[in-house]
A protein has these predicted regions:
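Short glycine-rich anion-binding loops that position phosphate/pyrophosphate groups of nucleotides
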Residues: 120
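A structural feature that tracks compact, well-ordered secondary-structure segments
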Residues: 123-125
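Nucleotide/phosphate-binding catalytic cleft detector across ATP-hydrolyzing
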Residues: 1-8, 12-117, 129-170
């Protein structure tokens, strides 16, 4: 199984085996998506293609199929662009799922919540008896967290981004 997530902060590809266990993954910080919308189509295709090639070399196999993850509630708004990016990078797009629901395909929770804190938004899925009963996309994410760090510590936004990603500050 291969999944592609075009995020506000990162573009990610994850590969799972037949038992849905992670076997490979790659990511790159990128500014190709803003507020769930692809704003740099060519850049997004290039990054996904490069990550795909990196993983194919690592696994010594060709990745043919991929599903895409999109922010909750944006399927009518931008899912076509996400699908086109995936296809433009050389995959056959098999499915598009909201990010939290896609995560639960791996987690397989029966009851609870999946919270996906992204760069620009936070996706939330509530599950009951294994079914998604509520989906929301809140307009707060890592970018907002960086703004808080910048203000609290008197840093530039870029310095706050670097500070936030440094594991010694966790």
């Amino acid at each position: 199984y291969t999944g592609v997530d075009l995020g506000t902060a990162c573009v990610v590809i994850a590969v799972l085996d037949e038992n849905k266990r992670p076997v490979a993954g790659a990511y790159r910080y990128a500014d190709v998506v803003r507020d769930g919308m692809v704003v740099d189509y060519i850049g997004a295709v290039q990054i996904v293609r490069e990550l795909k090639e990196q993983i194919e070399e690592q696994l010594d196999t060709e990745l043919i199929y991929a599903a895409g993850a999109i922010p909750p509630g944006t399927d009518l708004l931008d899912s076509g662009a996400v699908k086109n990016v995936i296809q433009g990078a050389g995959f056959e797009c098999t499915n598009l799922l909201d990010e939290s629901t896609a995560a639960n395909q791996v987690l397989q929770m029966k009851n609870g919540a999946v919270v996906d804190i992204g760069g620009g938004t936070t996706g939330i899925s509530i599950l009951k008896d294994g079914e998604v009963v509520y989906i929301a996309d809140e307009p707060t994410g890592g970018t907002h967290f960086s703004l808080v760090i910048a203000g609290a510590y008197g840093k530039s936004f870029q310095e706050a981004e670097v500070f936030k990603r440094d594991e010694s500050h966790h």
